[in-house]
């Protein structure tokens, strides 16, 4: 994109191409644009739109309509009332866009069904590059969610970078299903922005349960693509659903093991592509996890590693971004991920990585889900919450001993039915500690505490 250019079209797709699978079938680019323009003329006169639409097509349409109307879309880290209210308090000139109502905040329904009869458009809107189009909030996994402003220049050039990184040699249209919400940066980039500049038709549904994911995939024609997270695809694999060929599985939000990637590739006849990125910078690298340990950086990005920190640079980013990760450069445009900056722990004078410990926990054959963590800064021992049906905490401890030093063995280990993951599959520290303390207090109150559920 020439630096002198002041605007960029909202999509580079052909008008006759299919861009979405809506509730009533395929939607062409021409139909989509006409509906977005019509919706833009109906939106309330506010600066900010909090887009909480549960239907991905409604979110897509609402976002593009807001962009055309010159409004900025706010994307909370989740749809919980307290989170949304905090965003509304911080950005007062706002309204709710979608199917969620809250007292004291104006709501506008996308109502995409009423727009279905509008005559397809032949005009493609141009958007000023300096226009503030979205504010995306971090997941809050390491603290309070923070806002990140996204200008049109950042979004469109990021989408073009992602197209080059993710759609390598892809000529046929991909029919894409996403299990992560569009309000999250990972879901936003792949299921909302990428279809505007790549041969992708995105499904309107956001399935959560394994059977629903499998059925939604089967309803799409080949070639299919799945945008998901390790937690979601692991559950999908473990549910023994009917096999359906998936051309590409794109995964992000948490590290994926090579073992899981290999199992997914074999079961679904797929290629698993893991994505590295963050809310602040977006998608910046990829790897074929089943066969590669190094990350391949996108052409648009560069890394500067030194003095205990890593800076990310790209021409479409308004400023350098400091990664909350530790990386090691390993050749041209390649790097090795060493863990989160905050995941190093010191136990009994020894330093260890929580990311590595959790990788070893998740590698156990009987563990469906789990997390090893430090309950608080003063703790002298790690703890773990583990989903392992039919297993006892002592069994998990014995299985961990061959691969983890004694100082880093988690004690206590609590067996739980499930972990309180966000829609993206992430776990926030606040929720983990809250669940841990709730279980610990309940155990402490039991007169006859069962040794099978806890290890000391």
List the predicted regions and their residue ranges:
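Conserved pre-ATP/AMP-binding loop-to-beta segment of ANL
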Residues: 2-5, 10-15, 115, 119-137, ...
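Conserved AMP-binding/adenylation subdomain of ANL enzymes
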Residues: 157-175, 183-225
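Conserved C-terminal "lid"/linker of ANL adenylate-forming enzymes
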Residues: 345, 385, 399-456
């Amino acid at each position: 994109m020439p630096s002198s250019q002041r605007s960029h079209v909202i999509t580079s797709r052909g008008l006759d191409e299919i861009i979405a699978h809506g509730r009533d079938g395929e939607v062409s680019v021409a139909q989509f644009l006409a509906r977005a323009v019509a919706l833009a003329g109906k939106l309330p006169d506010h600066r900010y739109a909090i887009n909480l639409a549960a239907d991905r097509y409604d979110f897509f349409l609402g976002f593009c309509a807001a962009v055309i109307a010159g409004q900025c879309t706010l994307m909370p880290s989740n749809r919980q009332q307290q989170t949304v209210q905090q965003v509304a308090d911080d950005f007062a000139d706002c309204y709710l866009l979608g199917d969620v109502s809250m007292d004291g905040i104006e709501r506008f329904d996308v109502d995409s069904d009423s727009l279905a009869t509008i005559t397809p458009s032949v005009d493609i809107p141009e958007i000023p590059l300096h226009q503030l189009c979205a504010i995306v909030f971090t997941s809050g996994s390491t603290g309070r969610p923070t806002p990140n402003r996204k200008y049109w220049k950042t979004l469109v050039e990021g989408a073009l970078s992602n197209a080059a990184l993710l759609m390598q040699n892809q000529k046929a249209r991909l029919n894409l299903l996403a299990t992560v919400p569009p309000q999250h940066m990972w879901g936003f980039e792949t299921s909302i922005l990428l279809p505007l500049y790549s041969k992708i038709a995105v499904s309107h549904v956001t399935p959560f349960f394994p059977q629903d994911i499998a059925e939604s995939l089967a309803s799409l024609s080949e070639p299919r693509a799945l945008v998901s997270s390790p937690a979601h695809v692991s559950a999908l694999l473990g549910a023994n659903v009917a096999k359906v060929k998936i051309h590409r599985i794109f995964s992000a939000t948490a590290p994926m093991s090579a073992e899981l990637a290999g199992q997914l590739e074999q079961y679904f006849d797929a290629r698993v592509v893991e994505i590295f990125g963050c809310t602040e910078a977006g998608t910046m690298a990829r790897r074929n996890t089943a066969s590669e340990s190094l990350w391949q950086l996108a052409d648009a990005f560069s890394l500067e590693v030194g003095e205990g920190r890593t800076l990310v640079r790209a021409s479409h980013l308004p400023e350098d971004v400091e990664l909350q990760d530790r990386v090691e450069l390993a050749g041209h445009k390649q790097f090795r991920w060493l863990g989160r900056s905050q995941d190093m722990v010191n136990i009994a004078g020894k330093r260890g990585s929580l990311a590595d410990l959790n990788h070893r926990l998740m590698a156990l054959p009987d563990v469906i889900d789990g997390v090893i963590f430090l309950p608080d800064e003063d703790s002298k021992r790690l703890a773990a919450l583990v989903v392992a049906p039919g297993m006892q905490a002592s069994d998990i401890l014995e299985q961990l001993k061959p691969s983890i030093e004694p100082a880093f063995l988690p004690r206590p280990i609590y067996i739980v039915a499930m972990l309180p993951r966000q829609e993206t599959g992430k776990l926030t520290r606040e929720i983990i500690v809250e669940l841990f303390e709730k279980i610990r207090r309940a155990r402490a109150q039991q007169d006859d505490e069962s040794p099978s559920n806890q290890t000391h």
